[in-house]
Amino acid sequence: IEVILKLFSKAGLQKIFATLPDSQSSSENSHRIFALKNDYVKTIDQVILFLQGKNPTLARQICTMNFLPESSRFNQLDDMEFAFGNMGLQDKAKHLATLYLEDISDFIIENIDPDFGFSRYAERLGKSANSFDDLYAKLNENRTFIDEISLNILAQKLEFVQPKLVCFSVPFPGNLYAAF
């Protein structure tokens, strides 16, 4: 969660967008997100606070459809009033905020780290128990942007706690890469 919160923050998005030259993003969707980068940077901290339940009053602003920058995930919006009319403003806003985060996630996957996922980072590397060649190869590559965030957070925790022993639990294939 800490990695996601660091990544999906004003400072995190500024670093992401700063790593790419203006012309590097490839798809139309990525070009749109990059063009709206200032809007994403301006809104991300508020959206995360809303999704954490720390700013519920933002729901009305999110639902105006003028607050969040929109890219391809918003193309799948059908009749929002039909879908959320009875469920209320909070649920509609959570749905829109999730689409917003998924747009950013798509951008990260395409331009920063193809293995990124909210809960399944590099999952494909741990799915095949008969060979760890892909995992070994990935571990021998240069660290990714997200690797650096993860390792910095880990270093801070280790320095603060100064444990004698560190153990990692790997309950799902999507956790295997991060454990190494």
How would you name each of these model-derived features?
Residues 1-180:
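A short, structured N-terminal alpha-helical element that caps or precedes a catalytic domain
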